[in-house]
């Protein structure tokens, strides 16, 4: 991967010991970027996929301290509100991306395990099949982790966990007194993963849109004005440099 001098310069400004262990990304702005260029939404989604693939490779190759990457690929709200035509196109893109990931040498060389979070049962069977193949291909890896939130909503994740816990109480597998924040965490889609240290959102909107709600209490947030198809390594590094300058207090 050939890097520009500016990217190399920014990399040298990083303290590799202070990189966020868990990076969350909300890649917002594909549709607005397409509209700005007089193109249909599909054009923005295609460009956005290319940006995701490039950013992912950059992180995995150049920022080894980032062990967990969680991408907000499609919110449940977006799934419900997008037209059938746009959803079909997005599902096609997901299938293509996941097939490419399964064959990507870097994923296997660096032992990147892939996971999916969300109401996955709402997805079409052909997409689920491709996702399952990717899961199986990486299930034994444990060096790095790549998580995709699809048909995901943080409130739904919490309510899903509550239902599972309530069922266990009814079956007398646990008592109400045993319910605490750790028990709830262990019933979330994200169980086993530490909370995000840094969440980057592109597109200029300053909100988290129900992303990893249970886990983001002490996450650092960075809002980029760049639309996702405009996002690049320079913008990523600026966000991480900004993060490293912050003093994380964790409520103290």
Question: PLM ranges: what are they?
Answer:
Residues 1-252:
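Flexible, compositionally biased loop and terminal segments
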């Amino acid at each position: 991967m050939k890097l520009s001098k500016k990217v190399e310069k920014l990399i040298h400004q990083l303290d590799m010991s202070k990189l966020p262990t868990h990076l969350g990304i909300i890649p917002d702005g594909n549709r607005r970027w397409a509209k700005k260029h007089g193109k249909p939404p599909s054009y923005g989604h295609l460009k956005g996929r290319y940006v995701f693939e490039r950013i992912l490779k950059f992180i995995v190759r150049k920022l080894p301290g980032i062990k967990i990457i969680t991408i907000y690929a499609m919110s449940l709200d977006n799934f419900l509100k997008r037209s059938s035509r746009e959803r079909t196109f997005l599902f096609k893109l997901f299938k293509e991306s996941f097939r490419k990931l399964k064959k990507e040498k870097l994923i296997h060389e660096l032992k990147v395990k892939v996971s999916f979070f969300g109401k996955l049962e709402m997805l079409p069977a052909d997409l689920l099949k491709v996702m399952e193949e990717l899961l199986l291909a990486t299930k034994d890896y444990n060096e790095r982790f790549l998580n995709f939130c699809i048909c995901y909503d943080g409130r739904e994740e919490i309510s899903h966990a509550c239902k599972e816990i309530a069922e266990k109480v009814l079956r007398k597998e646990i008592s109400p007194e045993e319910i605490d924040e750790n028990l709830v965490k262990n019933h979330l889609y994200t169980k086993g993963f530490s909370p995000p240290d840094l969440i980057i959102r592109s597109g200029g909107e300053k909100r988290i849109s129900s992303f990893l709600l249970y886990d983001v209490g002490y996450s650092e947030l960075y809002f980029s004005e760049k639309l996702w198809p405009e996002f690049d390594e320079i913008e990523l590094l600026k966000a991480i440099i900004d993060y490293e300058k912050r003093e994380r207090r964790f409520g103290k």
